[in-house]
Amino acid sequence: MIWIMLATLAVVFVVGFRVLTSGARKAIRRLSDRLNIDVVPVESMVDQMGKSAGDEFLRYLHRPDESHLQNAAQVLLIWQIVIVDGSEQNLLQWHRILQKARLAAPITDAQVRLALGFLRETEPEMQDINAFQMRYNAFFQPAEGVHWLH
């Protein structure tokens, strides 16, 4: 009889946990599926943001607009390069990921401010983010003799 109660309690706990976290998992999966990556980098970023900023990011990501998904991808890019690993190889890898997802675009000042808001608990240096912004946006400068069609 005790085993039945323990099994029932375990099932209720697991189902309750899944129901309570379904919105967060859905928002994280939306970004990771679009980028065709594992959910671990997105979950790690949300965890490092802290409780309030992480919840704000998930609410922001839960909005249905494509622009919100674009901005969330840019925040993930900023976190990956400025906070996690600023190597050239990592930058090129994430640029390719964004290109494949059709989310590669120059980082705007508004996206930098958005990232600073979400990443406020990690206290990124503004000059590091600005240097990264210039470095990343150089990918979108026309090469000599090449003109982009918009």
Swiss-Prot record:
InterPro entries: DUF1198
Origin superkingdom: Bacteria
Protein's recorded name: Uncharacterized protein YicN
